[in-house]
UniProtKB/Swiss-Prot annotation:
One of its GO terms (cellular component) is nucleus. It comes from Trypanosoma brucei brucei. It is found in: Cytoplasm; Nucleus. InterPro entries: Ntn_hydrolases_N, Proteasome_bsu_CS, Proteasome_sua/b, Proteasome_suB-type. Signal peptide: none annotated. PROSITE patterns: PROTEASOME_BETA_1, PROTEASOME_BETA_2. Pfam families: Proteasome (PF00227). This is Proteasome subunit beta type-1.
Amino acid sequence: MIEDFSEHHVGEANTLQHHGYPRKLGNSVLTLPLRQGAKGHPQHWSPYTDNGGTIAAIAGSNYVVLGADTRLNGDFCIHTRSDTSKLFKLTDRIFLASSGMQADRLQLQQMLKYRIQWYQYNNGGKVPSTKAIAKLTSTMLYQRRFFPYYTFNMIVGIDEKGAGVCYSYDPVGSTEPFRYGTCGSASSFVEPLLDCLLTRQHMVTQAPADLTMEEALGMLKNAFTGAAERDIFTGDTVCFHIITADGVGTEMFELRKD
């Protein structure tokens, strides 16, 4: 019986080996093929993400009204409804306004802050002009042109003559001063409205004269209200900064929450 049992299992082992299985399994290692992506759907990774939000500004003869919503998005989620990091105070009369990726936005803000502090340290506490800070921002963005900050920026403030000025940038630092500007997820809704109300370059009727501070603030409130109705990445609250030669005033304006 023992001989029959041994012969039976030896024959079975030979049969398994014949079909490609190893004779000994004690030291064998089980390996699985790597999982492949579905055909036609290659896997991509991006270092950037857009956290949404909209900024807009109108410059007048002696003021600038600057606004940004407080919604911080990620994909189709709302991370917070009280994000005020889109507006960053550089000096008493100059602000950096940014939308886009929050991490890059915060990095750019800190780098500009350190460069301005370094300038003041080397110049006896002298505050750089709005034009100088605008040029510095352009240079810093251009230095990162091969791996740019994923931010959409404006420098706004009061110039040496006491007039409001707004500098708008592309991702690699090209800029020029404008009377008004807007960036962010709802800029395609806000900018045509400001074009229509402020310059009327595409209309026969003459453009209005310089707005008062109250008129500019009301115009931006209407623009953000309309943007929140059309853009899901803009909403909750708008933080307005009214910048003059005497200082900065702040006003909060409620938008829809959904």
